[in-house]
Amino acid sequence: YKVSFKKIIHILKKLNKIKVHVVGDVIVDTHSKTSFIGGQTKTPTFSVLYGGKDDYVGGAGIVAKHLSAAGAKVTFTTVLGDDLLSKYVVKSFKNTKINLTAIVDKARPTTNKNVIVTDDYRLLKIDKLDNTIISKEICNKISKSIKKTKVDSVIFSDFRHGIFNKLTIKELSGSINNKVFKVADSQVATRWGNISEFKYFDLITPNEKEARFTLADQDSSIGNLAKKIQEITKSKLLILKLGERGALCVEQSKKNMAFNIGSFVENVVDPVGAGDALLAYSTLIYLKTKSLVYSGIIGSLAASIACEVDGNLPIKKSQILAKIDQIEKLLNLK
């Protein structure tokens, strides 16, 4: 398959008219900065001095922001608590072109994951959340939002904080127009997500751990793992994320194409959120090109940039273009 830097650059400049609806759990990622003071002599307790914090919109929220940064016209539907963090989330979308539908659930807090950091070491994470299933009323509101929004693609970004479960996935999936490109990603880093619950989607992007968790399979080769995941989900396209080993891309078609893409990461600073960048850009590129090759490559480039910065920030097209320029120079092609 012939791939050129010129074609990648051309594709990146043509993403402005794509309409995408992101549905999923928003997370406020907090980095609390501290300095180490010392430890107690009587108990195994260490002491740190608080030095401030940075908040980032993560989860499905950053997926929406990646898409917008790429030039797509984005609608984002999520559930928030009735608290200060929900106001922060809403405010963070005010200066963007994203159409936010924030459904307030007074029975739950806005999901917050607070990492305590000392000298770039992550000492502890404190979560504030409620993973109980959303009410039928809220599910109906999300369903109506999906039905009324005319888009090219719907992305379900599942972090298992209430929106998606066995009951709601069926209803919400059924609300998507059959002509719309359906994408799903389900996180199980510390939760109980299950990508196999998203049936007949066009593209799914689990990582290796999520795939093995879904299948209860720690022994199969990567190739067999990918095959089993596609068989159980009936998905057309699969990008299986392999961390520092890159990604395996599989297309179930007449060609039954499968190929590996190596990692483009040079210096890992913060890998959290890399999969969200891949999810966003891979979706847009496939919609534009119908090529899983370019979708996988550009998605992996976006993920590598996300790994090389601290905090969960939207990846811009200009950053990917700069990365491509850097790679061209390393290969002595420029």
Question: Which residue stretches match the model-derived regions?
Answer:
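Short acidic loop-to-helix transition motifs that present clustered carboxylates
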Residues: 85, 109, 161, 186-192
